[in-house]
Amino acid sequence: MRRALLASILLVPCALPALGQAPLPPADTLGVYSGAAAETRTVLTFKVNDDVVQKLLPDGWTLAPIAQGPAKGANLSVVFAERLATVGPDGKAVGGEEASVILSIPARNNAETAFAIIEAYSDAATAPGFYKVGKPAKVTLERSLRATNLTGTIEESWSVAGDGGERITLRLGYERSQPSRVQVDSRNVSAADARVRRTYRIDQGLVVLASAPNGVDQAKGLTFNATGGLLGRLFDGSQQLVSAVSLPWYSRQLYVPASQ
């Protein structure tokens, strides 16, 4: 493969335009096409206790903090995803709209890099999900836009109430701005079973709201809290927010290994 798979969109420098990127490898090198999805996302990354996250990885995998870009140094990603549509390999709609929150760790197994999905919260009907780590929860999203001639402020409020007592809240506001288009391939594996994996061919718009490494602080009133279960171990008060990004559009093609 001419280009190594990137573990995350957050490896991409925040101002990288699509025209400046190297061509992606042919899609048939990624595996068997299994569908596509369209979403809107908000992503936070954190630096948390290395020992805690290492113990959550599959055998043979080691922690590999994000090496560059707005999330440099982060070892945990929290994705707030609003799924708008999903189609199967035949192009027919599957599933419906859904809000979910996904936790993942950047990791390495020898030369292979990926994000290990350690936990996800979504509607009970979809748990435990493809990666086998989903937990039933009520996920509530409120988003508002105040704009004049499409210039204005967006406010988001997320809450997660897991059936096992897990709780997550996120609130933030930011000025609407022109996203940078980023196209990238990314691999995810299940922390419960690394043989369960997908590769995504992603086309997205990226707006950096906050980045400690790059000195960016455009998020307004950002508050995040997570408690209960695994969340309590990850967010024990010592965590540091590394970055926050908005992905106003996020479309991906899904590929799985031929043997899966």
PLM features: residue spans?
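Bacterial N-terminal signal peptides
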Residues: 7-15
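Generic structural hydrophobic/aromatic packing signal, biased to beta-strands
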Residues: 44, 78-79, 103-105, 118-119, ...
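N-terminal domain-onset segments
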Residues: 21-84, 214-231, 235-244, 249-260
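Bacterial N-terminal signal peptides that target proteins for export
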Residues: 1-6
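Interaction-surface and assembly-scaffold signal
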Residues: 23-24, 136-260
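Aromatic- and glycine-enriched beta-alpha-beta binding-site module
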Residues: 83-159
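Generic structural microfeature
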Residues: 15, 47-48, 100
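Sec/Tat signal peptide C-region and signal peptidase I cleavage site
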Residues: 16-20
